[in-house]
Amino acid sequence: MNTLAGSLRIGRLELDNGLVILVNERPDSELIVITGSSLAGAVFDGRKRPGLSQFTSGMMMRGTKKRKYMQIVDQTESLGAGIRFHADDDLAWSSSRCTTSSLDKTVELLFDCMMNPTFPEAEIEKVRGLMLTNIKEREDSTQAVAQRIAREMLFPEGNPYHSDPGGYEETVNAITREDVAGFWDQQCGPESTILSFSGRITLAEVEKKTKLLSRDWDARHPRPKVPPVEVLRPIKATRRVVPMMHKSQVDIVVMCQAVARSHPDNYALASANVILGRLGLMGRLGKNIRDKQGLAYYATCSYSPRITGGYWTAFAGVDPANVDKALDSMKHEMAEISRNPVSKAEHRDAATHQVGSLALKLESAQSAAAFMHGIEIHGLGLDFVDRYEDIVNSVSREDMRRVCQEYLRTEEACTAVVGPCQA
């Protein structure tokens, strides 16, 4: 029995200007969620402008040709709605929430922000200040610093995934209004944008509203292409220690290059990641390093497939006295899953976990609206959810062992150790 069949019905249309519209009708939901994405993430920042995508996203509500910043804020609040913008590695996102009664005004506000930003100089400086504060906070977090350093070691300078998406003090200080306006013009047109709607609304209603609001929104450039991520192998294993003596905990990050979301090995890596870091709360890593040995406050892992590349990351927070033992145990688990097939019970539980997690996720209009973007961006097909259970169940124990042997190579992993320890 396919437990996911029929759980996400998607209507799709593409307007003449290239804007893609996705609709998940939920007749019983008074809440409507609108999620937007554009090919305008950090991979487009360039070597000299890390942080530009997040800077641009931070400016999208800061004033338009029709409204000043506080007018946008006041009107959004008066509707009981919410609109926000942010950016990640590949994409710039908008997230909007409203009720059916406030839909028309909320959508008009959203389109005004997307189509008509003016990037006032005074607001540029406010957003710059916020970003610099975020950077200072990031650089005082042992986990955030460890993740940044591991990523910078794993992906060489010039690689689209080398730099922190939030930028650095010197690059954020150097970004100008012209940089922001130029980035928006180049990356954020309708030809680059997807809008998904989830709630009590039909495809026909969305088509009527979006055609009217975007009638003057013309495609300005060809659809952007995400820069390719060159995988340089063999990668030399690298370890870097950063002392932060005012902290009480050491954070360890071990990172390996993985694959793009569209790669055939994606599903096997995702299943292996569940076994290593999810089952039983924190997977094999947590069970061994935290529960059995008592070496860590937490130990887990994550898998991050992107449009043209990806990475796998193991994390642990430990007492300074346990750094070497914990790191050895992390690498032991990586080697073990690469040498020997997982148990039949783990294999079954990993598939059940993934199917159940998706079923739970799709109960939320917000999660469903975001999930539709992945389906569109990666070309998975509108029936992807119906096929997902069969896809996950087709991953074998040997598939998982093979991909772990290929990608979770301890001899190529980049390790960052940050906290009260000596370099």
Q: Model-found features: residue ranges?
A:
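A common structural junction motif
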Residues: 112-121, 212-221, 332-341
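C-terminal hydrophobic structural anchor segments
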Residues: 348-381
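Short alpha-helical scaffolding segments that buttress acidic/His motifs in well-ordered protein cores
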Residues: 56, 106, 110, 114, ...
